[in-house]
Every structure is written in C-alpha cells, then in structure tokens.
Amino acid sequence: MASTADFKNGLVLQIDGQLWSIVEFQHVKPGKGPAFVRTKLKNVLSGKVVDKTYNAGVKVETATVDRRDTTYLYRDGSDFVFMDSQDYEQHPLPESLVGDAARFLLEGMPVQVAFHDGAPLYIELPVTVEFVVTHTEPGLQGDRSSAGTKPATLETGAQINVPLFINTGDKLKVDSRDGGYLGRVNA
C-alpha cells in the first residue's frame, strides 16, 4: 500500500486486478476544498491511458515490479531475446510486449525488463541511444519546403526527422521515447 504522497512516475498500481503505471501526477491544493492528486495512468498490458483523481492521503494498492538489467541479443521470428545481466538467463519476449521500442533495438543494447510475479510486463530502453544514419538525401540549404528537416533511416530501419546538415554515415543521439533527434555524436 502506498499513500498519494508516495506517488512518482513509473510507480505501478494494482487497480481492479489490473496493473497501471503512473505516467504523470500533480498534487493540487485548491483555495477552497481538500487537496487532491490528479494522475495519468497507463495500463501496463494494453497501453490504454486514463486520467484518475485521488483525494490526498488515500492509500492505494501497489504492485511489486522487479526491473532487471538485460542485454538485447537477437530477434527470433516474432520474439525478441534478452539476456539477464545477473544470471545470464535468456528471456524471449513477444513482439506485442516489446511494442514501439522494437524500432530502436540494437544487438548488444542494455535494456531494462520489468517483471511481475515472474512474468515480463514491458521493456524500458535507455532514454538516449546512439545510431548511425544508413540513408538520407542530401540537404540543400535553399530547400525550405519543410521546416529545415529531412527524413533519415537509422541502422535499425527506423525513420526519424533530422536537420539538413546530417549526412549518411553520421552517428546521432536519439530520444528513444519519441524518436526525436537530440544531436550528433562527436567521434
């Protein structure tokens, strides 16, 4: 059990037998009336996001989630195989569980896998990851039909928008949460 004062992003709650992760929360103290906590919760299995409000100080049921450091090894059909960094056990995870993170997975990449009662729930990539651009069109300085960006294909096959000065072969820092360009990596 946890109080609303213990809320933090990533905390997993058990509500009506389902697991929900806190995406956002905000303590609100209105001028009139009692304080409350406004939350945005994401269903761990389905990915559905809902808004829920709790009175301040209310106790809620939390779920024990074990986050383990793993390394992504390879793809086997529709499964992604991860190796636990402590006991070297391999965990094949289905494509549905990996979700959108699959477009940023590179062999040998460190990844956290969350487990509940021994069953894998979801994976967490590092926030910033580095990739090599395998293909992008040359950017012309006078070409301003777009907002100064162009599409680029990364070594994983994912496509992101990058500034015009990026060339094929450049190494980039990318935000794994939204696929946003963060900068070039200096060699």
From Swiss-Prot:
Localization: Cytoplasm
GO biological process: peptide biosynthetic process
Record key words, sorted: Cytoplasm, Elongation factor, Protein biosynthesis
Gene3D superfamilies: 2.30.30.30, Nucleic acid-binding proteins (2.40.50.140)
Highest taxon of the lineage: Bacteria
GO cellular-component term (any): cytoplasm
Pfam families: EFP (PF01132), EFP_N (PF08207), Elong-fact-P_C (PF09285)
Cytoplasm keyword on record: yes
GO molecular function, one term: translation elongation factor activity
SUPFAM superfamilies to which the protein is assigned, alphabetical: Nucleic acid-binding proteins (SSF50249), Translation proteins SH3-like domain (SSF50104)
CDD domains: S1_EF-P_repeat_1, S1_EF-P_repeat_2
Pathway(s) where this gene product acts: Protein biosynthesis; polypeptide chain elongation
Function summary: Involved in peptide bond synthesis. Stimulates efficient translation and peptide-bond synthesis on native or reconstituted 70S ribosomes in vitro. Probably functions indirectly by altering the affinity of the ribosome for aminoacyl-tRNA, thus increasing their reactivity as acceptors for peptidyl transferase.
Family indicated by similarity: Belongs to the elongation factor P family.
NCBIfam families attached to this UniProt entry: efp, PRK00529.1
Protein name: Elongation factor P
